[in-house]
Regions:
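Short, surface-exposed amphipathic charged segments that create phosphate/polyanion-binding patches used
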Residues: 56-59, 115-120, 208-215
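Catalytic core and acceptor-binding pocket of nucleotide-sugar-dependent glycosyltransferases
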Residues: 132-234
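Short, flexible, basic/aromatic active-site loop/helix in glycosyltransferases
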Residues: 117-131
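GT-A fold catalytic core of metal-dependent nucleotide-sugar glycosyltransferases
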Residues: 55-116, 141-142, 146, 150
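A short acidic, often aromatic-flanked loop/helix-cap motif at beta-alpha or helix-coil junctions
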Residues: 46-51, 108-110, 199-204, 229-230
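A general structural motif
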Residues: 1-2, 72-74, 98, 217-219
């Protein structure tokens, strides 16, 4: 039995350039897993028609996918493919206390508040929780105790799919992230928030995403999201490639 890092990397034929940089993410996590005696699992195939269920929701099937693949696991990290991990990142599984772990979403608060307010009003009957406990879904640690919890979210999604899709299209809000947040707080799942350095989102806005690689000096997991003027994911590719090669040399293997 081992800890698992789970990622979803599915090529969208309509936006083929989007996945180009993700190999740098996967390879960085593969090296980290080898160093820390963990297993990497990358889902690269559709399990639903994309018009019915977008791939970012596939993360909810992590337990079923691992078990159907015959993988016996202890804890799981579900990580987004636009992250690169520092090779010396501490083993965060040892910090979990067997709780559901995440990192506060410290990025665009307009987007966070818009997601929070509209999901609360239109989907969760006015339920509220502290905005400072609203987390980013790009780095989530869980274990077998959370399997039924995820099954509940899946059931809820399909019962409310049309409303959820309409909320996303109408208000430009998050997809799986707000729903997971509301479920964690509504069902009183024991949550441990880890420091920002384990999911460094929105680095451009924090003025640390520069060629001096300052961001690599202050944290462990670099999340290359919310980069402005990012046409065809060119800047995502630039930064993920540069970061990977900064740690591992010029060969992406």
């Amino acid at each position: 039995m081992s800890n698992v890092v789970f990622m979803v990397n599915i090529k969208n034929e309509n936006v083929p350039t989007r996945v180009v940089p993700y190999e740098y993410s996967i390879n960085s996590w593969r090296k980290w897993c080898d160093k820390n005696d963990c297993q990497l699992f990358v889902l690269d195939e559709y399990i639903f028609d994309s018009d019915y269920l977008r791939p970012n929701w596939y993360k909810l099937y992590v337990f079923d996918l691992l078990e159907n693949s015959g993988i016996d696991y202890d804890q799981i990290l579900v990580a987004d493919c636009d992250t690169v991990v520092h090779p010396d990142c501490p083993n965060f599984f040892e910090l979990s206390e067997n709780k559901f772990c995440a990192v506060h979403n410290d990025g665009s608060y307009d987007w966070v508040c818009r997601s929070y307010e509209n999901y609360s009003k239109h989907l969760f009957e006015g339920f509220e929780f502290s905005i400072w406990e609203y987390f980013n879904s790009g780095f989530l640690i869980m274990n077998k105790n959370h399997k039924q919890f995820y099954q509940n979210i899946i059931k809820f999604y399909f019962e409310n799919r049309d409303l959820i899709v309409n909320l996303q299209d109408t208000f430009g809000v998050g997809t799986d992230q707000p729903v997971i947040n509301f479920f964690v707080h509504k069902e009183d799942v024991e949550l441990k928030l880890l420091p920002y350095r384990f999911n460094m989102q929105d680095m451009f806005r924090k003025e640390i995403l520069h060629d001096d690689m300052l961001f690599t000096k202050i944290g462990w997991v670099y999340h290359f999201n919310a980069i402005p003027n990012n046409v065809d994911s060119q800047l995502t590719t630039y930064w993920m490639k540069k970061t990977y090669e900064y740690f591992h040399g010029g060969k992406n293997d």
